[in-house]
Amino acid sequence: VAFYLLEVRGQRGPIVKTLSSGNMLDKLGKLYGVPVHETGVGFKFVAPKMVETDAMIGGEESGGYAFKGNVPERDGILGNLLFLDFMVKTGKKPSQLLQSLFDKVGAHYYDRIDTKFPSEQRDSVRQRVAAVKPGITMGGLTVESIDTTDGFKFVFADGQGWCLVRFSGPEPLIRVYC
């Protein structure tokens, strides 16, 4: 939907996304000359940042989007109407729109894995994740930087992507986004 607002409607304004969202929005922001702000996970962080920056769109990994001029909260109806308008104005099917986006910013892939672990191991698991430092190799990729705003986001060198590890508050559960 951000691609539609930028490309078809010609709108310009900040974009707000969560740490767990992919980096397509960063590439769109760079391409169209608009700032992209990253927040903690959840609309409790997205909404205030949208108001603060007068953002044109804000969203999170789960598919929730909010839009300038509307309540800064997830609005699936408006998001779907905008997507339908994108299809009508371009005459393209969703698969063709996705290909158009990939043509602009390159193909992107995303996954989230939720993994349970024994609750008595919470501290040791957290310590192992926290022990990762820049320069360490994970899965053949070198960690360039780490953002601990909301979990542990490992950004890999040479634009090779990122991996966010978040611990569930009440459950012995790790959420891994990449």
Regions found by a protein language model. Give the residues of each.
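Phosphate-binding and adjacent anionic-ligand microenvironments
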Residues: 7-178
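Extended, hydrophobic alpha-helical segments in both membrane/secreted and soluble proteins
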Residues: 1-2, 25
